[in-house]
Structure formats: structure tokens, C-alpha cells
């Protein structure tokens, strides 16, 4: 199966990066003609995110999960199979799960902790289309500090006033629904959270690509601040005004989608079996 075009020419201003010169190709999210087409697109992108996270060495045993809502049945979501190597996940391997934890499509088990948390996030926040959580080294190290990130780079500024530290169920394996609901409620309207003593969560309001990019950027921001603080020198913070300006222009759903396109293109070109 070959993937559909990932983008098309823009007909209107979609990003500060969009050129003013006419006739140039500029990526733009696709427009779907049917719910089936949109479902396939979301599943393809979710499988691609699994491959990308494997490339980036975000895997840690069976820990980690990514999800996206079904476009026709918003109370159901697609997710990766439990204990399957992220580097081999294909479109046909993805599981369709409801909020009761029932696997409606697929024949693999679902990650129980992943189901409890992601199901609660999707239930509590109807604006969330996709979510990502992995046990990454930098994310877990920063989560152990129980602090939000400081605006010390443009990357970190992208999360200015749009990420939070969650202390509910800190360090505990969340496998019961009440615990999952508590974490989801504390998530608020943020696009990212640092779950103390656990790791990072990100969500996408408009696309799977968005959620994936926020996770990549958040993991990088954690790494950068850990390294900067390790020097022992005081951090030079970006001013609140400049951080807010960067967040407004560089941290939009469209900007995140654009950032993910070259990453997606690379994995789609070199690992076409993900579309099987």
C-alpha cells in the first residue's frame, strides 16, 4: 500500500513560514473526501510515529503508547499493540479500543496502563485528537525534579504557559481508572505535561503529527536544560514577552505539523512496509 500525498499547495496563509512568493510548493495538511480516507491517514501517521520513536530510541521495553481518535467514532481510539517492537508496527497491527478497554479491532493485547491513562485523557479532553507517552531518558530525568521547564531556548519557549507538572499518582504505575481520571483532570488545557517521577505526555489538537512533534520537542527541551544546568552556571532566561511571542508564532498546531513532515517523509521513504 502506498501512502497518499502528505500535503498539497496552500491556498491561504497557514504559517509564518509560508512564502509570500506565488507558485511555490508549501506543505499543507490534506483535506479528506471520506471518513474512511481520514481513518486510513490517521492510522498511517500513527504507525509512522511508532517507527520514528523507535529510530529515536524512545522505546523502553513494553513501556510507551501512542493514540489517535477514530474520525467516525470519537469514543474509540487507535493505539499500538502491547509489547510489539515500535520498529515493526504496521498499519494493520494497530488496535481499535473503546473507553471500556475492549479491543474492537486487532488481536493483540492493549497496554493496560496505557489504556487507563490515554482513555482518560481522551474522555476528559474532547479537543484532544492524539496523544503520546514514552519512557525517555531525558524526560524521566527531568520528571524526577518535579519542575516545569524554563524558557531558555526557542524550543522550550514553545511550551511557555502551555505545559504543566502533574504530581497526582507520581511514580505509581497507573492501572486503575480512578488514578487515570485524576491524571487526566490535572492535564488541563496544556499540550504537554511532565508527570513527576514518570515521564512526558503530549497531545495534538489537530493531528497525530502535532502530538508526535511536541513529544520530540519536549524530550529535546528536557535534554537541553539538563545539560545547561550541569554546567553549574546560571541560566539566562528568555523574557516573558519574547517567550510568549515565540510560543504564539512557532508553537502552533500547524507549526508542529510542519516540523514533523521531513521526519515522516524519511521514515515513509525508507520503511514502506509500515503502510501494510
What is the predicted function of each stretch?
Residues 93-95, 155-157, 189-193:
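Short, flexible, solvent-exposed loop/turn segments with mixed acidic/basic and small polar residues
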Residues 137-179:
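Class I SAM-dependent methyltransferase SAM-binding "motif I" and its flanking Rossmann-like core
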Residues 84, 136-139, 146-147, 170-173, ...:
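Short acidic/polar capping segments at secondary-structure boundaries
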Residues 68, 121, 135, 183, ...:
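Divalent metal-coordination and catalytic microenvironments
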Residues 2-5, 9-49, 189-276:
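A conserved C-terminal secondary-structure "cap"
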Residues 118, 139, 180-184, 208, ...:
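A general structural signal for well-ordered alpha-helical packing
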Residues 165-202:
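A contiguous binding-surface segment within folded domains or other stable secondary-structure elements
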Residues 32, 36, 43-132, 139-152:
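An anion-binding catalytic pocket shared by soluble metabolic enzymes
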